[in-house]
């Protein structure tokens, strides 16, 4: 009789907090290692409240020297809006250089048939600034970003270097209404081995939803649950809200937790 393979995460119960449309690919990573996955969709992603500033920037997109994407959502919503305006990101990429922060962001760009002109060695904003291939002086830089909650570090640093930076909201992340019942049941029964956060917003939205579902004592249900984060900014928010971080990915990706 064949013995079952003892996988690294065999039968571990893990909650993944992600946007609703981004959870599937991440689940596969952990399911392939033997884990049982519970969904906690902590973000829903859509256009910003006001689309006009994005349209104005996209109508002048060929005037920019560089576009800097710090998230996959930025790529998706810029391309989606360009197509509405009878263009595409791939078409624009023939004339403009593109830099990305993050391995997943670079992978998303690849899926659109576009090769990034610059990817920093580490998947954080500071690495992009420290290793950017040319001086920022005189550059016109387009920074599509989340409407609320993102960092201004890249924009500030390029402005300080003498760039003209156009920073506009390309998308907004909002908090969903509720948590799936099976996930709540697993938390109530204290069956969750680990909970994974990939951004500050997934931390704050998860906390909001957990308190809404479980009441003021919500944190006590996670006493036996390891809190895992991807990246230093996520860890900071997790410390502030949950009071601890049990492990941070060495490489700032989901795979970096394995």
Language model segments and positions:
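Signature of uroporphyrinogen-III synthase
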Residues: 2-258
């Amino acid at each position: 009789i064949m013995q079952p393979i003892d996988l690294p995460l065999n039968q571990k119960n893990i909650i993944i907090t992600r946007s609703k449309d981004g959870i599937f690919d991440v689940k596969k990573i952990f399911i392939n290692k033997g884990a049982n996955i519970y969904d906690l969709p902590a973000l829903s992603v859509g256009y910003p409240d006001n689309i006009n500033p994005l349209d104005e920037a996209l109508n002048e997109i060929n005037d920019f020297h560089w576009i800097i994407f710090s998230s996959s959502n930025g790529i998706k919503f810029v391309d989606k809006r360009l197509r509405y305006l009878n263009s595409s990101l791939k078409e624009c990429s023939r004339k403009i250089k593109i830099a990305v922060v993050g391995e997943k962001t670079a992978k998303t760009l690849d899926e659109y048939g576009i090769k990034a002109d610059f990817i920093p060695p580490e998947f954080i904003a500071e690495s992009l600034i420290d290793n950017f291939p040319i001086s920022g002086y005189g550059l016109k830089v387009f920074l599509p970003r989340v409407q609320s909650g993102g960092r201004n570090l890249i924009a500030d640093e390029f402005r300080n270097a003498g760039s003209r930076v156009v920073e506009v909201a390309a998308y907004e992340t909002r908090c969903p209404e509720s948590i799936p019942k099976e996930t709540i049941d697993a938390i109530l029964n204290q069956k969750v081995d680990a909970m994974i956060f990939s951004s500050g917003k997934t931390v704050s939205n998860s906390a909001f939803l957990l308190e809404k579902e479980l009441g003021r004592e919500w944190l006590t249900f996670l006493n036996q649950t390891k809190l895992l984060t991807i990246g230093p900014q996520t860890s900071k928010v997790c410390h502030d809200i949950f009071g601890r971080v049990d492990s941070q990915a060495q490489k700032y990706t989901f795979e970096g937790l394995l």
